[in-house]
Amino acid sequence: MKTPLTEAIAAADSQGRFLSNTELQVVNGRYNRATSSLEAAKALTANADRLISGAANAVYSKFPYTTQMPGPNYSSTAIGKAKCARDIGYYLRMVTYCLVVGGTGPMDDYLVAGLEEINRTFELSPSWYIEALKYIKNNHGLSGDVANEANTYIDYAINTLS
C-alpha cells in the first residue's frame, strides 16, 4: 500500500541512496499532520453510526426512488436499507484508513481498483455515495486542521466517484 512515507523510502531505496531533503520534508510534513489525522479518524469512527444513518437519509431525501423501487439494489426494504448503510460505512472506513496512513493508498487499493465494475454489476449509482459523502463532510462536526485532514480524503472519494 502506497503512502507518502513508503513512496519516499521506495524512491530512495530503488536508487540506493539516503532520503533527499525534499523527501525528508515530505516525511516531516506527514508527521506534522499526523496528530490531526488521527484525531479525525477517531472522531469519524466514534460518530460513524450517526454519520452513516444521516448520510443514508440524505440519499433517500435526494433520491426518493431508492426507497420506492423494489429490488435488491434499492432501499425499499429493511434489508435494502441495511445494505445502503453498509456501503456508506465502507466509504467512511476507507476515509479513516487513509487518515491513519496519511495517504490515499487504502482507498486506491481496496476501493478505486474495482469500483466501476462493482457499481456496474450491482447497478449502483455513484451519485448516491457522492451525496452520502457530502453529508458526512458537512456534518462531521470537525474543525480546523482536523477537518482539513478528513475533508482531504472525503473529497478524494467524491472525486473518484465523479
Curated annotation (Swiss-Prot):
Pfam name, any one: Phycobilisome
Task of the protein: Light-harvesting photosynthetic tetrapyrrole chromophore-protein from the phycobiliprotein complex (phycobilisome, PBS). Phycocyanin is the major phycobiliprotein in the PBS rod.
Keyword Membrane applies: yes
Signal peptide location: none
Name listed for the protein in its UniProt record: R-phycocyanin alpha chain
Topology of this chain in the membrane: Peripheral membrane protein
UniProt miscellaneous comment: The light-harvesting antenna system in red algae and cyanobacteria is formed of phycobilisomes. These are composed of the phycobiliproteins phycoerythrin (CPE), phycocyanin (CPC) and allophycocyanin (APC). Cyanobacteria also contain phycoerythrocyanin (PCC). The phycobiliproteins all share the same subunit composition and organization with variations in the covalently bound open-chain tetrapyrrole chromophores.
Chief subcellular location: plastid
Subunit: Heterododecamer of 6 alpha and 6 beta chains. The basic functional unit of phycobiliproteins is a ring-shaped hexamer formed from two back-to-back trimers contacting via the alpha chain subunits. The trimers are composed of alpha/beta subunit heterodimers arranged around a three-fold axis of symmetry. The phycoerythrins also contain a gamma subunit which is located in the center of the hexamer.
Family: Belongs to the phycobiliprotein family.
Keywords recorded for this protein, A-Z: Antenna complex, Bile pigment, Chloroplast, Chromophore, Electron transport, Membrane, Photosynthesis, Phycobilisome, Plastid, Thylakoid, Transport
Subcellular location: Plastid, Chloroplast thylakoid membrane
Binding site for (2R,3E)-phycocyanobilin: 83-87, 115-124
InterPro entries in the cross-refs: Globin-like_sf, Phycobilisome_asu/bsu, Phycobilisome_asu/bsu_sf, Phycocyanin_a
GO biological process, one term: photosynthesis
GO cellular component annotations of the record: chloroplast thylakoid membrane; phycobilisome
